[in-house]
Amino acid sequence: MKLKAIPLLARTRHGHNDFPKIAIQPGLLQARHKVTSAKPKASSTLAVTSDIARKLDKTGVWKKTGGRKKVNAPRAIEPRRVNIISDGLCDDILKYIGPSIERHRGCDLVDLNPGAGLWSRKLHEVLQPRKHVMMDLDAELYSPFLGDLLLKKNVEMMPKSGLVWKDLLEMIRTKLSDQHETTQDATPIRNDTLLVTANLSMCPKKSFLGFDSISSMVLYQFMSSIRTSTLFQRYGLVRMLIWVNDEDKRRLLPRAINRRKRSAFEAELSCEWIHEVAGQETEVQDRNALRDEWINTESACHTLQRMKAAGLVMPPGRESLVYSKLQSEPELWGQKLAGVRPPSLTRPFKLELEDLEQELPGSSETSKRLKALRQREKYEQEDALTYLELLQERDAATSLATSAPAKFDKANAAWNERIDNLKKNTRNEFNGFKDSNHLFRQAPPVLLWDRRAYEPLPARADEFFPNAPTALLDIQPKAMHPLFRQHGPSSSRAGDMSEVMLRFWFHHTLLPIHKAMEGLWGGFGDLITECPSVRDPSRGGTPMTGNGALTVRAMNGEQWAEILQAWMDWPFRPTYTQMLGRLVEEAEADADDEDTKSGATGLAF
């Protein structure tokens, strides 16, 4: 399949029977059981819970009725739009992150898809912007909701779509006269005089140009603009407050290593932070993307400590389960938990076992099931003890690498032999614990989720209309490594090359780094010696070999920069066109790409 440039894309600019209960059932896990076990009830997505929702409902835009609508009935050009309709949610959010956005007071505010405008009005009141430019293709439909806001002299509505790049670029060119573009060679700095907010949440979602929704595509392109200094990012590092469908937040902000795809890695390269300010409180979607519950607990404890230091508390009535649970368990705060206690996963059978153990003796079938589940729990506990031993042996061996090389070689070989003797599924599960622990133990942790400044505020589906679970992401770009900023034919194209290489890289996440390098192009694997951070524990590497070698999925941004530099310095590297032709075809042939689907990877090459 040939790549086609997407019309909307901006152009490049320059868990033993006597096993301690706490060891397999962390407090955080106990709290989660109540969430993960809940089955969603079938209900309409048009529940009315506020005056704004009632007015929206009366328009009839979201009601599916047979026959033709009345001639004068309100119509929507974008009828899939999800509106924020909860005053309480908006007030809680702005109070929660208020100190953080105070630096934008008096800024230029760009507001895409404001809809009924509740969020827009609240944000305007807090920021008192110099200029507030709104873009909404359904401006006529929503004008009765925005009347008082539109009367302000510093507020302007453009009845065009902020998701169509032609219209967006026109707005940027004509309405942001007080902003100044950064030069191509300059290191971009934070621009607090411009703030972008957008509502990309849709219900129902509809695939578009290979993406699972147009909002997924726009979010993808907003992130790309950071790397290429296009759109708003041409004016410096511009913060973005983006409303997205709740399920889309994990693309940029995964909570487990096997959800860390290319888009999440590139976000780590280009963003100082991505915070989930508010979102649906559930872990159901993570059952296939699990990690040690002790990592989750320790990560949450660290977050609560950061919140305490910053004077942050969750608003009354909007405390999350995690926040409430750990507030009552201060003995866990400040402790090293992961890698010290036997690892545990949130498995559905554990809740079933807990329920059966609380019931009175029943039928023989129930007794057989209970016996089987207890046996499974026993095996899992035994495996957990083995995993803990292996993690600790690995750490002990690593500590010998510099001080006692001979002892390290012996310990490394013995450890690898133990791994080789594990059954395949057991080995695979251990590797997941190993790599997750490796990412978490770096300073700071590699996943942006583990660096969060606060716990997300729980947001209910009925605080939106239609009632679609929606999340607010706070995205703050950072100055990337100079190599990653090289885009376009007038540059070294290192940034372009990085993007193409990562498409191959993240289809082979279980490979050791040196094998992945060799897979990029024959002979490149020999340059592993030019990438010392891969084997340096102080920089997120490991001296372990074989089963203990650093894998692609456990790589950090600094290591990728080193690998890219080695590539750019390699006299035998292929041209950009050769790489594009070979590696994009390989990436497209693999259907397991959550970043984009089908031919949607089409960049404006």
What does each of the following model-derived ranges do?
Residues A5-Q486:
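Catalytic cores of RNA-modifying enzymes
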Residues A38-R68, R460-A471, I475-F605:
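C-terminal target-recognition/interaction regions appended to catalytic cores
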